[in-house]
Amino acid sequence: HPGLEDLQHKTSHAPGHVFNRAKVKVKPTLINLGPEVDPNQCVGTYVKPRDWNALIRDPEVVLIDTRNDYEVHAGSFEGAIDPKIKRFRDLPDYVQEHLDPSTHKKVAMFCTGGIRCEKSTAWMLEQGFEEVYHLEGGILKYLEEVPASESAWKGDCYVFDERVGVDHDLNPSDSAKFCPGCGHALTIKMRCAPEYVPG
């Protein structure tokens, strides 16, 4: 199909069906941070999964999890800042309130598959941040390529299908379960809390 020549196809295996249905739509943008943010024009530096650990261990690097709060509950990288956002489009508000390009010289960002980080790093560069990095292929590519024994990832990775979460080997996780009441992924610890009410 014209325009899809450079499409990066990703395959993920599961023991059964993980989607009730599939729908394909053409949209002007997949992730929205405003019309002026175009990662095709300006984007942060891609960091291969094998090089990610060295980057995030640099004490000058501010590591930001760009995912929504319910995704972060399932797992994240050691030392990552959780901006506690409800929607990705709220990330700029967090950055404007907590980060400063003159103080925070190096920023590394990550998300599930890398799409949100392309947008967020483009936006960060437009705000004057000079060194902005993001994990190429996102968390899922990191889990696929970096052995668990060398991993800086803790917990599961929330995914947007019936699996809810996958472990470091990309197998469906028993730790994170979907709560139909709040619509979030709940860890075992959250489900064992005294205030937890099923449903």
What are these regions (language model features)?
Residues 45-55:
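Phosphate-interacting basic helix/loop segments used at nucleotide- and nucleic-acid interfaces
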Residues 1-45, 58, 68-107, 115-199:
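Rhodanese-like catalytic fold shared by cysteine-dependent sulfurtransferases
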Residues 61:
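Hydrophobic "anchor" residues on beta-strands that sit immediately upstream
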Residues 64-65:
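Structural scaffold elements adjacent to functional motifs in cytosolic proteins
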